[in-house]
Amino acid sequence: MTPSTDLNLPLFERAKALIPGGVNSPVRAFRAVGGTPRFVQRAQGAYFWDANGQRFIDYIGSWGPMILGHGHPAVLEAVQKAALDGFSFGAPTEREVELAEEILRHVPSMEMIRLVSSGTEAGMSAIRLARGATGRSRIIKFNGCYHGHADALLVKAGSGLATFGHATSAGVPAEVVQHTLVLEYNDIAQLEEAFALHGSEIAGLMIEPIAGNMNFVRASVPFMRRCRELCTQHGALLVFDEVMTGFRVALGSAQSVYARDIPGFQPDITVLGKVIGGGMPLAAFGGPRAIMEQLAPLGPVYQAGTLSGNPVATACGLATLREIARPGFYEALGERTRALTGGLADAARAEGLPFSADSEGGMFGFFLLPELPRNYPTVMTTDGARFNALFHGLLDRGVYIAPALYEAGFVSSAHSAQDIDETIAAAREVFRLVSAG
């Protein structure tokens, strides 16, 4: 494909004249890897087709929601039926009650839930709720964890534990982030020092249990255990951001994975998104009844939304959750994902390239490093130039991974063994070229 025949390019030029950067979310612009974004025309199963009609094996899946693949028959049927009943009412429906029941059935830490329209909205509301429920202002977050683009959470680390964070975006006043303390992921000593200094002021600790915006970095079990202990000890709320991991890594979400090693483990507030909407704009946050009843109209913490509980989105999410709750679903999904990461690792190492990978359920990540990183500074040591070469080599061969070094990948139940084999074969060719170059 040459620039003169690539139909994605004129679409991108048209978009750039109308939309900042030509995209409606920055990572889609290919700024990190260079080149022209692929404009999707349609998708089905494990594939999408771009403006040129080229088919790609899709390992993004709308950044996680498409756990069943694109166009699953049961989901399509549910959405079509709901659309015939009406797009939006601004009033309660039975379907949103059914979706709430389905979510709570699988996530026992949540006794009540509030539906919203995006992960950012859910995260922002969870922080407001934590502050309202505790009467405190300080929030802990971790370097490299992304919780949406709410002002108070667009923060990078300060110069030390005695100082609070600095905004990572223009337009965010310093006074908005002065109550946000940023720590290094998986650093128990730093965590303990933060609570020793500020414990009585901390409303909540917000964490991605698997940091999907550092590609794929797990919170260690000892670190997570200490997060829970310190929050309990100091009266702070543990807020689990499972927008990405919720129903993606296990039916009980990532918190159920940690509960295997930490008896009785539960967060205080859980933030969900992506999979629970099945690809439509839907997210949620929830927790124990005593905390959730602090929300309006019952309590003093205000939260509202015109499209919250949208009837078409809830139909999509409900159909998705009912499909993934079938026996054996996650076992098969995890096996397929491990086949992918294992095959990629073998192919890279055969060419003498450093490579490490990890996965849980249908979520995975890999690094061009000999060992898995444990926090943002170690993630940053990976070879960006080699990753970009790998990305474009796979893209040329019809395999679509995230166009950024620091984003997780996703396998769906629609990915076949043949898709995995085709991907590994393509990667083997690219690793050979990268190693030689």
Swiss-Prot record:
User: EC top class, in one word?
Assistant: isomerase
| Sites of N6-(pyridoxal phosphate)lysine modification | K274
The membrane-spanning stretches of this chain are none
EC number(s) on record?
5.4.3.8
Offer an example of a GO molecular function term for this protein.
transaminase activity
Tell me which cofactor or cofactors this protein depends on. Answer: pyridoxal 5'-phosphate
Pfam family membership, one: Aminotran_3
Entry-linked InterPro entries: 4pyrrol_synth_GluAld_NH2Trfase, Aminotrans_3, PyrdxlP-dep_Trfase, PyrdxlP-dep_Trfase_major, PyrdxlP-dep_Trfase_small
What are the annotated GO cellular component locations? cytoplasm
> Which keywords does this chain's UniProt record carry?
Cytoplasm, Isomerase, Porphyrin biosynthesis, Pyridoxal phosphate
What biological-process GO terms show up in the record? protoporphyrinogen IX biosynthetic process
Please list which residues make up the signal peptide: none
User: Where is this gene product found?
Assistant: Cytoplasm
Q: What is its main location?
A: cytoplasm
Q: Which HAMAP family has this protein been placed in?
A: HemL_aminotrans_3 (MF_00375)
Which PANTHER family did the record assign? GLUTAMATE-1-SEMIALDEHYDE 2,1-AMINOMUTASE, GLUTAMATE-1-SEMIALDEHYDE 2,1-AMINOMUTASE 1, CHLOROPLASTIC-RELATED
What is the designated name of this protein? Glutamate-1-semialdehyde 2,1-aminomutase
Q: Which organism is it from?
A: Paracidovorax citrulli (strain AAC00-1)
